[in-house]
């Protein structure tokens, strides 16, 4: 079956770079005359007849990200792109664009599967009992041939501190929890250690400028490795483990997801899906991050252990804040934007929330008092 891949860069200046990377990256892996790769700046035209749509957008670009981090830090709270004030600010300007894209897909490709990039994971040779939200989950069991080997891992300090989460949290704290939390929980467990850290937002902005000056597969790979090496660098003293850098990235998992749907090949992946009855602390419509069974019918959550008791309050609070962010983004009202920021546990202040909205160059002009 012939396949057409249409890339839709957000800026015309990105087209040449995208073409160059795809052309070289192919390297003969695609069957000759079976895959056609094109680029377009017309989203509606690109969507027509699509079976799958991959969405990976950063509204406001890296300039927006740098502002997310620097404004939050300047107001005395954590300056990080994903969690806290930075994550809320990113959501406030992204939701309207995502809704517009969804509407256009419903018109031009109503039968398409839409895969939105978050941070999915693949299960290989083991069953991972993992539950939570995006960037806020707990690994509570690792089952190999029917046996949970997580207790053995927690008892072995050397092995436990040989990977990223073990180095980040330390063996003693992980044993106290009886689970391995997602690395982003570090921002909640040790707020005082990270709130004083420098913002990383300016680094990828400069890095991107270098890449688009002379795009190539080599510079693309170098850019990717630099990004992985420096991510959450403020939380650790050592270099990131090479195993974490060579995993292929979540783009590989997204392709596995597409393949499972297209070929009806049953696959289990950790994905963000509607909760239904999976986690008892959340309602059926809440989006959760859990192991999911994927086939031609899509992805369905699999029954897993519940969120640890100590995590229930945080999970429910962040889900409330997530919905407040969506409401603010759609309404465009300053009061709702302030509320969304103030409700986040890493902000937890109405006065600071107001300062962030007024000081943020990507928010102040949009969220004005009504």
Predicted regions and their residues:
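Short acidic low-complexity segments
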Residues: 36-49
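Long, compositionally biased stretches enriched for glycine and/or charged residues
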Residues: 126-370
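Structural motif
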Residues: 6, 40, 117-118
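Glycine-rich phosphate-binding loop and adjoining beta1-alpha1-beta2 segment
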Residues: 1-32
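Flexible loop/turn segments at secondary-structure boundaries
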Residues: 11-14, 47, 62, 122-125, ...
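Residues at the starts of beta-strands that form the adenosine-phosphate
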Residues: 2, 36, 113
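N-terminal Rossmann-like NAD(P) cofactor-binding module of classical short-chain dehydrogenase/reductase
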Residues: 47-57
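Rossmann-fold NAD(P)-binding glycine/threonine-rich loop
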Residues: 59-128
């Amino acid at each position: 079956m012939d396949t057409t891949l249409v890339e839709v860069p957000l800026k015309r200046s990105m087209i040449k770079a995208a073409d160059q990377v795809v052309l070289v990256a192919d390297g003969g892996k695609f069957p000759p005359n079976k895959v056609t790769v094109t680029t377009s700046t017309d989203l509606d035209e690109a969507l027509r007849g699509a079976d799958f749509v991959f969405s990976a957008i950063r509204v406001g670009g890296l300039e927006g990200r740098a502002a997310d981090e620097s404004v939050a830090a300047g107001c005395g709270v954590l300056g990080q792109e994903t969690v806290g004030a930075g994550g809320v600010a990113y959501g406030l300007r992204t939701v309207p664009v995502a809704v517009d894209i969804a509407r256009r897909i419903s018109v031009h490709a109503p039968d398409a599967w839409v895969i939105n990039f978050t941070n999915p994971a693949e299960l290989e040779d083991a069953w991972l009992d993992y539950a939570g939200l995006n960037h806020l989950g707990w690994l509570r069991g690792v089952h190999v041939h029917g046996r949970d080997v997580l207790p053995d891992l927690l008892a072995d300090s050397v092995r436990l501190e040989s990977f990223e989460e073990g180095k980040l949290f330390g063996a003693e704290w992980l044993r106290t929890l009886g689970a391995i939390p997602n690395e982003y929980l570090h921002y909640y467990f040790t707020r005082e250690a990270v709130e004083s850290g420098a913002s990383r937002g300016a680094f990828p902005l400069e890095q991107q400028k270098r890449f688009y000056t002379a795009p190539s597969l080599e510079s693309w790979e170098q850019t990717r490795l630099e990004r992985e090496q420096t991510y959450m660098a403020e939380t650790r003293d050592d270099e990131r483990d090479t195993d974490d850098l060579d995993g292929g990235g979540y783009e590989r998992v997204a392709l596995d997801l597409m393949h499972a749907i297209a070929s009806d090949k049953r696959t289990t992946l950790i994905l963000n899906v509607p909760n239904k009855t999976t986690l008892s602390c959340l309602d059926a419509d809440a989006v959760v991050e859990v192991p999911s069974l994927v086939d031609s019918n899509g992805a369905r959550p699999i029954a897993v252990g519940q969120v640890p008791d100590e995590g229930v309050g945080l999970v429910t609070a962040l889900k409330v804040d997530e919905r407040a962010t969506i409401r603010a983004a759609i309404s465009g009202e300053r009061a709702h934007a302030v509320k969304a920021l103030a409700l986040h546990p890493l902000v937890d202040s109405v006065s600071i929330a107001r300062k962030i909205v007024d000081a943020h160059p990507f928010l102040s002009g949009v969220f004005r008092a009504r």
